[in-house]
């Protein structure tokens, strides 16, 4: 009970204390409000007093100037240190005007020095003054900036001071910089990566990400390092007189590049060439086996790049059998097709890190079991096939998506008895059904893939040795020459044919060795090229001459030239030899680029050739009769 009563008493005391605090606070608030009201009342007459006093001072000054003194004592007696003045702070403050003049009242000094009474002439009572401490505050004048077209320049003294300061500061900077660099060096030393172990290094080197990066980056670096620019080239043409001989030679045939790789192509025979339809600078070459390197793969296909001056192939592909033919998949820019000596068709993909084929055909009776010298992709973007023919006369049609079995196969047999040993094949321009083939027996055959007369239809005789190359006319123009084709043979000749006549139209007999390959220009109707076993490249323009080549060049070392291939533009020829080298020749503009009348001129040339052939046949018949 006693605890409860004490608690109640304590609460009562606290309540009383709170009530007292509230009352005192309320009383102080009322006093403050009263003082504010009084100050507001006094503020208005002060302004009037100040105006009145100002006028009075002016009057006194006027009287003094006239020699009349005022009643007010000019110099009051000094106040004693003990004198005290009582007054309102607000009134004391109001006496200080803005310009530092005295207040607006007349002062009357009392005889008693201890007190000073201020009597207001306006009828106010005496005010007590008190000593106050004044705080002096300086306000800088407002800066006025005027934006005019005048030139504002600082004084030279300020500039010199700033320059002196700038000259003095760098002297102290090196020490501070060295101090800052020390901790940074410590941080760099601490952030150094740890030393990799041999196992970790091997793991990184064999990772797929590193292989992709290394393969891609080395190609780019190699291209950059291989570029050569002629910094002395003169665009004004002043040096053309000196180069006149070179320019004349350039109008015919001039060596541009030579591709050879010590490991992959040296001591190998170039068996086939093909330019990429999508990337005109890429050239694929297939190679036979290297007898001096039995541990290397027998078959190699290299993709060379004409765009960059590097000496190594862009891609290296290989397989376990010698590659006898190769071609870019016409509608697949990443695929390369190869025909091998074992009879397999292989497919490489440059998107894969593998150098070995991503697909291959089986070695079975359903596919090829003899060397494949002919592969070609025919058709359109949405409907195309890979056509391959082996030396046993078997033709297969494949889908590039599935090489496990052919879509169609056919035995090329003449008159149901004689199997054709095909060595070369060519399709006319724009035709995917009819084609011509050359054989080991020296005969040429026309054939078709489909229809009532599928297979071999006609035989053309004229060569006295195996046919090494055959090519149909491909230059498109106002006149259709797709019925014409050329053949090259071991009998040292090149022959011109028409599928409308089973006898050759003309025989070009300027060579003195095996002629290994022949090909029409893709842009000029009357121009073709051929290569022989003595290392000679010949260009024939039938509109100019049919007896001797228009241009001819011999390769250094006179290696046997096995294959040639025109570029799509008709301005370059790629030639492969028996030593694994590929020579790129530039064809001069005067030869390579056809004029507008070349097609009509070639028609007249063919008419003359036919007339001469008929005359020769009549003459031969007369001699036989005699």
Curated annotation (Swiss-Prot):
Gene3D superfamilies the UniProt entry points to: YVTN repeat-like/Quinoprotein amine dehydrogenase (2.130.10.10)
A single GO cellular-component term on record: cytoplasmic dynein complex
Broad class of where this protein is predominantly found: cytoplasm
Basic and acidic residues: compositionally biased ranges: 20-43, 177-197
Result of knocking out the encoding gene: Morphant embryos display defective craniofacial patterning, microcephaly, a marked disorganization of axonal patterning in the head, reduced number of axon tracts crossing the dorsal midline, and increased cell death.
SUPFAM superfamilies given in the database record: WD40 repeat-like
Acidic residues: compositionally biased ranges: 160-169
Keywords on record: Cytoplasm, Cytoskeleton, Repeat, WD repeat
GO BP annotations, alphabetical order: microtubule-based movement
Subunit structure: Homodimer. The cytoplasmic dynein 1 complex consists of two catalytic heavy chains (HCs) and a number of non-catalytic subunits presented by intermediate chains (ICs), light intermediate chains (LICs) and light chains (LCs); the composition seems to vary in respect to the IC, LIC and LC composition. The heavy chain homodimer serves as a scaffold for the probable homodimeric assembly of the respective non-catalytic subunits. The ICs and LICs bind directly to the HC dimer and the LCs assemble on the IC dimer.
Function in brief: Acts as one of several non-catalytic accessory components of the cytoplasmic dynein 1 complex that are thought to be involved in linking dynein to cargos and to adapter proteins that regulate dynein function. Cytoplasmic dynein 1 acts as a motor for the intracellular retrograde motility of vesicles and organelles along microtubules. Plays a role in the development of anterior brain and cartilaginous structures.
Family named by the database record: Belongs to the dynein intermediate chain family.
PANTHER family in UniProt: CYTOPLASMIC DYNEIN 1 INTERMEDIATE CHAIN 2, DYNEIN INTERMEDIATE CHAIN
Protein name according to UniProt: Dynein, cytoplasmic 1, intermediate chain 2a
């Amino acid at each position: 009970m006693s605890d409860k009563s004490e608690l109640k008493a304590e609460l009562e005391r606290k309540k009383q204390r709170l009530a007292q605090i509230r009352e005192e606070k309320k009383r102080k608030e009322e006093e403050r409000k009263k003082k504010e009201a009084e100050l507001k009342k006094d503020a208005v007459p002060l302004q009037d007093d100040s105006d009145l006093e100002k006028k009075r001072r002016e009057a006194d000054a006027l009287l003094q100037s006239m020699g009349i003194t005022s009643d007010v004592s000019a110099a009051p007696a000094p106040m004693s240190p003990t004198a005290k003045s009582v007054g309102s702070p607000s009134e004391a403050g109001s006496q200080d005007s803005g310009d530092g003049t005295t207040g607006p009242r007349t002062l009357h000094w009392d005889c008693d020095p201890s007190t000073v009474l201020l009597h207001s002439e306006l009828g106010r009572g005496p005010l007590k003054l008190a000593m106050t401490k004044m705080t002096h505050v300086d306000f800088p004048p407002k800066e006025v900036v005027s934006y005019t077209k005048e030139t504002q320049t600082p004084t030279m003294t300020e500039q010199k001071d700033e320059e002196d300061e700038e000259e003095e500061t760098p002297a102290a900077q090196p020490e501070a910089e060295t101090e800052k660099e020390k901790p940074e060096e410590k941080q760099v030393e601490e952030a150094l990566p740890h030393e990799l172990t041999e196992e970790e290094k091997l793991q990184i080197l064999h990772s797929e990400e590193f292989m992709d990066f290394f393969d891609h980056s080395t190609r780019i670096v190699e291209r950059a390092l291989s570029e050569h620019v002629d910094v002395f080239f003169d665009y004004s043409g002043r040096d053309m007189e000196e180069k006149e001989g070179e320019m004349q030679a350039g109008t015919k045939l001039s060596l541009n590049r030579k591709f050879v790789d010590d490991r992959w192509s040296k001591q190998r025979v170039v068996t086939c060439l093909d330019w990429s339809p999508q990337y005109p600078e890429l050239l694929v070459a297939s190679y036979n086996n290297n007898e001096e390197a039995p541990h290397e793969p027998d078959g190699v296909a290299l993709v060379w790049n004409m765009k960059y001056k590097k000496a190594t192939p862009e891609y290296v592909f290989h397989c376990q059998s010698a590659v006898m033919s190769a071609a870019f998949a016409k509608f697949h820019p990443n695929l390369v097709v190869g025909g091998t000596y074992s009879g397999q068709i292989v497919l490489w993909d440059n998107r894969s890190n593998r150098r070995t084929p991503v697909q291959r055909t089986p070695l079975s009776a359903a596919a090829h079991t003899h060397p494949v010298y002919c592969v070609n992709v025919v058709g359109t973007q949405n409907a195309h096939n890979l056509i391959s023919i082996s030396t046993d006369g078997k033709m297969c049609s494949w889908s590039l998506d599935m090489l496990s079995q052919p879509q169609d196969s056919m035995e090329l047999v003449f008159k149901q008895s004689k199997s054709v040993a095909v060595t070369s094949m060519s399709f006319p321009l724009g035709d995917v059904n009819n084609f011509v083939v050359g054989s080991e027996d020296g005969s040429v055959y026309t054939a078709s893939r489909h229809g009532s007369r599928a297979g071999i239809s006609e035989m053309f005789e004229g060569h006295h040795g195996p046919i090494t190359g055959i090519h149909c006319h491909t230059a498109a123009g106002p006149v259709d020459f797709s019925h014409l084709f050329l053949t090259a043979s071991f009998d040292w000749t090149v022959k011109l044919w028409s599928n409308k006549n089973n006898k050759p139209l003309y025989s070009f007999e300027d060579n003195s060795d095996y002629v290994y390959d022949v090909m029409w220009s893709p842009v000029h109707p009357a121009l073709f090229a051929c290569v022989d076993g003595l290392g000679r490249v010949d260009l024939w323009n039938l509109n100019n001459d049919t007896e001797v080549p228009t241009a001819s060049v011999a390769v250094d070392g006179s290696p046997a030239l096995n294959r040639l291939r025109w570029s799509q533009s008709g301005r370059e020829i790629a030639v492969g030899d028996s030593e694994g080298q590929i020579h790129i020749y530039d064809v001069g503009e005067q030869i390579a680029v056809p004029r507008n009348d070349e097609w009509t001129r070639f028609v007249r040339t063919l008419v003359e050739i036919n007339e001469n052939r008929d005359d020769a046949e009549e003459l031969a018949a007369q001699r036989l009769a005699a």
